[in-house]
Regions:
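Catalytic cores of nucleotide-sugar-dependent glycosyltransferases that transfer UDP/GDP/TDP-activated
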Residues: 1, 5-196
């Protein structure tokens, strides 16, 4: 009964935490990565529940996020302009050229093209990317960002795209087909994270 569970759910004299109850009564606890499972056991990341995560660490596991190679395989992907593989990279350059053209970037095979695809949220560590943007642009790097999220992040990347023009493109949208072309055409994948 709820009355019996109150001592477990209670955070302090005036409040209860149903998440605490879920953590205490669950048969298994999973998170988005093994490192985040460790971080949750620390006061800074545990949000007051770190003690429970430590006590229940024997049933706490992180399932590493990853890419489905059956769907995101450049050797077989029908959403990209040309297929390639680690053993035959000859068509990779065509994917980059086509992406540069689509995004309005200079079609220059010698310029590094950094792509970032994902949620534009503070937890993703985009503050560091924003801080480094001037330096990237000064070095002749092309940057392409695709995603949606927090309004301040969306505005910042739209600002960079408008300010820097040609070497910077921000598409504030969810576009699965474009994400395939960006993974295939980019030279470097930027996937920052503040934590997890």
């Amino acid at each position: 009964s709820l009355h019996d569970a109150l001592p477990i759910l209670r955070c302090d004299a005036d409040s209860i935490n149903f998440m605490k109850g879920a953590l205490c009564y669950s048969d298994w606890l999973t998170t988005v990565s093994p490192s985040y499972a460790c971080e949750l056991q620390m006061p800074f990341f545990g949000e007051g529940l770190d003690g429970i995560f430590r006590r229940r660490s024997n049933i706490l596991s992180g399932i590493l996020n990853g890419i489905d190679q059956g769907i995101w395989n450049p050797a077989t992907d029908s959403m990209i302009p040309a297929n390639f593989s680690p053993k035959d990279m000859s068509n990779k350059a065509e994917c980059k050229r086509a992406l540069q053209e689509e995004l309005g970037l200079a079609q220059d095979p010698t310029r590094p093209l950094v792509v970032s695809i994902g949620r534009l949220t503070n937890q993703k560590g985009l503050g560091l990317v924003r801080y480094a943007m001037d330096g990237l642009m000064a070095r002749g790097v092309q940057v392409a960002v695709l995603g949606t999220g927090d309004a301040d992040q969306e505005e910042a990347f739209s600002y960079f795209s408008n300010t820097y023009g040609n070497p910077m493109c921000a598409r504030i949208a969810f576009d699965n087909a474009l994400s395939h072309r960006m993974y295939a055409g980019g030279d470097l994948l930027l996937m920052p994270s503040e934590f997890e």
